[in-house]
Regions:
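Histidine-/acidic-rich catalytic cores in large beta-rich domains
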Residues: 1-165
Length: 165
């Protein structure tokens, strides 16, 4: 797939990323799924981004990201992302997931393994966020503290009890 901008213009990319754009491929991704809009969303763990490690571990980040793929033209456009600005505090190197809820126009993102490499923390503290799709404002944020560093959460989903039971 060839990365393109919002106008369909090809981007100049290599292993170090793409020039003059926020487009990036996912690195160590989890939970890829198609949305009701036909886009692809993934939780981008972000480890080994651009096939290398940053100078400082605290420069790592994870994100939820959405792509529009045109199979006919073999192009991919990044249309949405969240998490990059939250930096290392929201970095989940091992697992995580993302879901789009079209009924509320929100993304549900679970950064599941945050703090796993922070030696000052005795437990993993996962973060489940519900993000307004248009504004990227956090509508709900839950911190989930595990019993220790050996208890690794995998995924979290917001469910509607009326439908689930």
């Amino acid at each position: 797939l060839k990365p393109v901008d919002s106008h369909g213009k090809a981007l100049t990319c290599d292993n170090a990323g793409c020039e003059n754009t926020d487009f990036d491929w996912p690195w160590m991704q989890h939970a890829a799924s198609l949305t009701s809009r036909g886009t692809l969303i993934v939780f981008d763990n972000g480890d080994a981004r651009h096939l290398e490690q940053p100078a400082l571990p605290t420069m790592k980040y994870s994100r939820g990201v959405e792509y529009r793929i045109n199979e006919k033209d073999m192009t991919v456009q990044q249309v949405w992302e969240y998490g990059k600005d939250r930096g290392f505090a929201w970095y989940a190197p091992v697992t995580g997931n993302i879901r789009y809820d079209g009924s509320k126009d929100v993304m549900q993102i679970f950064a599941s393994s945050t703090g796993i490499f922070d030696k000052s923390k005795k437990a993993i503290e996962s973060t489940f966020d519900v993000i307004d799709y248009k504004t990227k404002k956090i509508e709900l944020e839950m911190k989930i503290k595990m019993m220790g560093k050996k208890n690794m959460p995998y995924r979290a989903e917001k469910i509607d009890p009326k439908i689930a039971f």
